Design a protein with these regions (language model features):
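Beta-strand-turn-beta hairpins that frame and shape the catalytic cleft
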Residues: 20-25, 90-99, 139-145, 167-173
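A short C-terminal boundary segment appended to hydrolase-like catalytic domains
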Residues: 126, 134-141, 171-202
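Catalytic metal-binding/acid-base residues of hydrolase active sites
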Residues: 32, 57-58, 79-80, 104-106, ...
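Core catalytic region of metal-dependent phosphoesterases/phosphodiesterases
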Residues: 8, 17, 24-93
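Conserved beta-sheet core of the metallophosphoesterase superfamily
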Residues: 73, 108-171
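Aromatic (phenylalanine/tyrosine) cluster motif
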Residues: 4, 10-12, 21
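Helix-adjacent hinge/juxtasegments
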Residues: 73-78, 82-124
Length: 202
């Protein structure tokens, strides 16, 4: 994990056989100091190649990096004192570039337009972000948005949530998962266009 919170480009091209060209990513956000739960969940998952922590708190990502033997990308969030417009990362995969940010600098609680515009201006095909504590996976015209929600401080009566993203050379898919699998609360999903400027969620 990079110690500097400025923008970095990560290249993750899997050196696997053509039949096994899959990148599985454990995506979490807004753990707010309660990282033990995220570590416990990771240990129950199979075939994870990469962890992405989308901020709040930065030290949680550092702790996970120290305790787990797996590549990890972390960004700083608003609770980490980061208000830098360059505080994002770009992950280059065989699917394409993925924009990685906490989301507060792109005002994702008001609209997804800013983060989509910024990501697309950097030639990214997807944006992973946190900040809202509301899980989301949506696609429009080949562009994807993923927010894993929050494991520690979910909102709207949801259980704590996280995501597992699967990246292939021609596709990106993701599953929003909950710590209590017997209760699956509502998840924001569907068309990005229908969600733009829909501030009633917050």
């Amino acid at each position: 994990m990079q110690e500097n919170h400025k923008s970095w480009i990560y290249r993750f091209s899997l050196l696997k056989t053509q039949e096994d060209f899959v990148l599985r990513i454990f995506v979490i956000s807004d753990t707010h100091g309660r990282v033990d739960k995220a570590i416990e969940i990771y240990k129950k998952l199979d075939d994870i190649d990469l962890i992405i922590h989308l901020g709040d708190h930065w030290n949680d990502a550092r702790r996970m990096k120290e305790q787990l033997n797996v590549p990890l990308i972390g960004v700083k969030g608003n609770m980490d004192g980061s208000f830098d417009r360059e505080g994002y990362h770009i992950l280059e995969t065989d699917f394409g570039k993925i924009f990685i940010a906490h989301g507060h600098m792109e005002s994702v609680k008001q609209s997804y337009e800013n983060i989509m515009y910024k990501a697309e201006s950097l030639n990214c095909r997807a944006a992973f972000f946190g900040h809202t504590h509301i899980p989301l996976f949506a696609e429009a015209e080949g562009f994807y948005l993923l927010n894993p929600g929050s494991l520690s401080l979910p909102v709207g009566g949801r259980k704590g949530s996280y995501a597992v993203a699967t990246v292939l050379p021609g596709s990106l898919s993701a599953a929003i998962l909950y710590e209590d699998v017997q209760q699956v609360p509502k998840t924001e999903s569907g068309s990005i266009k229908n969600m733009l400027n829909d501030s009633d969620r917050f």
